[in-house]
Amino acid sequence: MFQTFVRFFTTKEVRNKIFFTLAMLVIFKIGTYIPAPGVNPEAFNHPQGSQGATELLNTFGGGALKRFSIFAMGIMPYITASIVMQLLQMDIVPKFTEWAKQGEMGRRKINNVTRYFAIILAFIQSIGMAFQFNNYLKGQLIIEKSVMSYLLIAVVLTAGTAFLIWLGDQITQFGVGNGISLIIFAGILSTLPSSLEQFAQSVFVGQDDTSLAWLKILGLIVALILLTVGAIFVLEAKRKIPIQYAKKQSAQRLGSQATYLPLKVNSAGVIPVIFAMAFFLLPRTLTLFFPKAEWAQNIADTANPSSNIGMIIYVVLIIAFAYFYAFVQVNPEKMADNLKKQGSYVPGIRPGEQTKKYITKVLYRLTFVGSIFLAAIAILPIIATKFMGLPQSIQIGGTSLLIVIGVAIETMKTLEAQVTQKEYKGFGGR
């Protein structure tokens, strides 16, 4: 492991990309401390302040929401917009479906529309959030309560989201890994110390016998280890489908090529978890604009992962998004076609349509197992807080852990691939 990190920093171009990525994430973190204009940063020191904040948004945004900073909206409007755009491509909007089939050019068009939609959504949610938080904090959040003040706050928060989208694009283009994922990753890690502090306080406060408190902490450590092992397994486990070559001349390539087709147990990675949590935020938008409407509050209460119905919905969403994105990441038809063109086949399976059906069947089974594991890891901390009396601060711990591990694994793979590429170029004398 140490030698791997040494390789990262001894390769100049990769080292520069790492430093660039870290610099962008530092800018993100600094922005979480810059308060939006016209708000009172001390308002969240109100006794009810921490309860009024949406813990998920605050965690993903690196604590920006509880400070009501310029990045208070975070990157979630973009993720929500991405969900909607992905669904609209499923023959709902013919133009989007057409773009999805146009390759790189089509993806650029879809990405542009996604960004515009995210900006509109961020503006709408910013206005509602300013009203809701000011009401919840008994009018202490907004200093000057005027239409212009609310509009200014909404514009600034929307600009903050737009800047984070741009920042993510810069990391993706000039840095290491997926920029949006790394921003969420950095946000979760930056809130970890405060979450641990809250957990420790909730465990020790009011305890005459500290042995029980230490037992809970030990239990949390063991649970974290088990969840980490489980997360790595579900994100990295593969099913190897054996491949054989029909042409004799292809035998010369066997020494340099894998003779199996690897399919991940969870091809979608942590995207289903992120999208499922983002989906839960949509009904809460109703309460931003209808704070006194009982029907809106009932919908928001139902769309809460900690409620009984909410947990079921959360699991169903994770499984649904896992299947959806598994077939986005893996195209059985294209895979079968490529195998046929290469003169290779799965033993006992005819090339072409039969191979496509076989890969589809295997992918369905793998995704079922992977999505169940994914959902279990995500909801176990919620169950622990609900039925075992553990503090609320660890409620989204499973979701956060999955995202952190998933992003870390993918970033490490990206770094290793870039280092290997540079080393091969070096051997080639370039």
From Swiss-Prot:
GO biological process terms held by the UniProt record: intracellular protein transmembrane transport; protein targeting; protein transport by the Sec complex
TM region(s), chain numbering: 18-38, 68-88, 117-137, 147-167, 174-194, 217-237, 270-290, 308-328, 368-388, 389-409
Disulphide bridges, residue numbers: none
An example Gene Ontology CC term for this record: plasma membrane
Membrane topology classification: Multi-pass membrane protein
Keywords annotated in UniProt: Cell membrane, Membrane, Protein transport, Translocation, Transmembrane, Transmembrane helix, Transport
Main location: membrane
The protein's name: Protein translocase subunit SecY
Organism: Staphylococcus epidermidis (strain ATCC 35984 / DSM 28319 / BCRC 17069 / CCUG 31568 / BM 3577 / RP62A)
